[in-house]
UniProtKB/Swiss-Prot annotation:
NCBIfam families: pimt (TIGR00080), PRK00312.1 (NF001453). Belongs to the methyltransferase superfamily. L-isoaspartyl/D-aspartyl protein methyltransferase family. It comes from the Bacteria. Keywords: Cytoplasm, Methyltransferase, S-adenosyl-L-methionine, Transferase. Its EC number is 2.1.1.77. The gene is pcm. It comes from Petrotoga mobilis (strain DSM 10674 / SJ95). The active site is at 61. This is Protein-L-isoaspartate O-methyltransferase. It is found in: Cytoplasm. It catalyses: [protein]-L-isoaspartate + S-adenosyl-L-methionine = [protein]-L-isoaspartate alpha-methyl ester + S-adenosyl-L-homocysteine.
Length: 213
């Protein structure tokens, strides 16, 4: 297969034509090849507009949904971002192409090691990966993040994650039941309260942890 062509078509038809217009996000999708993050036997489906299984009961998300979440985050070049749910590492790599530094947490050790190996193979130096309960946020040190992206469904906003946002920081998270959610964009206001905006409906795997399911 011509993966380069498939990648360009994905960006044009699945992202641009559905309202993803942030050039930083579109350029990241062109640089990061999705087929490198899926199982070999599923490579031919890598650029289809659908989630794919990656093992351990987890999936790599639909390209459009990832693009939408990244666009909602309003990412800037100097941002420091926390990702909850490394999974295959695909979204992590997209983030790493856009922002200065990405911290990412994965609860499954097998997926975490696989993603870490992939980051090293591809030469990423601005990704810090830890295994743990992502609902608690980054516990290794005190950091305030410009953005937080959560790649699993929560019943509500986990308080530890909101507390780790900078004033003016943004979080994008699917919130709802175990079977259907809506993307929420959470902004931390000057007074410490949250502004909530609603986006598309979606279906993510449950966010497992102390402040999740």
């Amino acid at each position: 297969m011509d993966f380069e062509k498939e990648s360009r078509m994905m960006v044009e038809y699945q992202l641009k034509r559905r309202g993803i217009s942030d050039e930083k996000v579109l350029n990241a999708f062109l640089k990061v090849k999705r087929h490198l993050f899926v199982p070999k036997d599923l490579e031919r489906y890598a650029y289809d507009d659908c989630p794919l299984p990656i093992g351990e009961g987890q999936t790599i998300s639909q390209p459009y949904i990832i693009g939408l979440m990244l666009q909602l985050l309003e990412l800037r070049e100097n941002d420091v971002v926390l990702e909850i749910g490394t999974g295959s590492g695909y979204q992590t790599a997209l983030l790493a192409e856009i922002v200065r530094l990405v911290y990412t947490i994965e609860r499954n050790e097998t997926l975490a090691q696989r993603a870490k190996n992939k980051f090293e193979e591809l030469g990423y130096k601005n990704i810090v990966l830890e295994v743990g309960d992502g609902t608690k946020g980054w516990t290794k040190e005190e950091i305030e993040f410009d953005g937080i992206i959560v790649s699993a469904a929560a019943p509500k906003v986990p308080e530890p994650l909101f507390s780790q946002l900078k004033i003016g920081g943004r979080m994008v998270i699917p919130i709802g039941s175990r079977t259907f959610q809506r993307l929420h964009k959470i902004t931390k206001l000057e007074d410490g309260n949250m502004k909530v905006e609603y986006s598309d409906g979606c279906m993510f795997v449950p966010l497992i942890g102390e402040y999740g399911w």
